[in-house]
A protein has these predicted regions:
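Active-site loop/helix belt of alpha/beta enzymes
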Residues: 1-56
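General structural feature for long, well-ordered alpha-helical segments within catalytic domains
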Residues: 3, 30-33, 64, 124, ...
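Short coil-to-beta-strand transition motifs
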Residues: 58-65
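Small-residue-enriched segments and motifs
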Residues: 66-67, 116
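C-terminal accessory subdomain/extension
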Residues: 73-183
Length: 183
């Protein structure tokens, strides 16, 4: 509001006062005079917002459904069909309190798999590792064809990769939402 007041005092009309960012949208105490709030990832939240305390894990609403397509057992890798074309190359959590690699791995139902992260991303393939957790038989735990969900570091960068979203409502019905293109 201070900038708008200074602009107006200089004799320039300033009808629109716009603020941005998800943390601002959630913490603002007084929006008097603000005509627009651009809340960023507010609708979905993401791992960056989770790391700074803006949201809880159960509030993360965007995920990418992926399929296990292979393994490199000697390296401890689970290979999926969701690479950086699906997830983006955003490593926004790498300097935060918890680094999620390229994304947090969950079961198809959305339950976190502790220690499982997307640690590598090629164009079409993601590489999941289980961190320090020792699993003798990755192929048995995550067989080819099994599906997982990946929670993104940055919902904007990931969401922009897709022309539409499949939204699940409280009753379990799936709806398709078309994405608006452009900023």
């Amino acid at each position: 509001m201070h900038a708008a007041e200074r602009i107006r005092k200089a004799g320039i009309a300033c009808a629109d006062v716009s603020i941005g960012s998800t943390p601002t949208a959630l913490s603002a105490q007084n929006l008097d005079g603000v005509t627009e709030v651009r809340a960023g990832v507010y609708v979905f939240f993401d791992l960056v917002m989770h790391n700074i305390g803006v949201c809880q894990t159960e509030e993360l609403a965007l995920s990418v459904l992926t399929t296990v397509i292979g393994h490199q057992l000697a390296k401890g890798w689970i290979i999926t069909d969701a690479g950086w074309m699906a997830m983006s190359r955003d490593r926004g959590t790498q300097r935060q309190r918890h680094d999620f690699g390229y994304g947090q791995v969950c079961s198809e139902a959305g339950d976190w798999i502790d220690g499982a992260r997307v640690t590598g991303a090629n164009q079409e393939h993601g590489i999941i590792t289980l961190g320090d957790t020792c699993h003798a038989d990755l192929a048995a735990l995550f067989p080819i064809g099994s599906r997982l969900r990946i929670l993104p570091n940055h919902a904007c960068a990931t969401g922009a990769q897709f022309p539409h979203y499949h939204a699940l409502d409280a009753n379990g019905a799936v709806h398709t939402w078309s994405r608006l293109h452009g900023w």
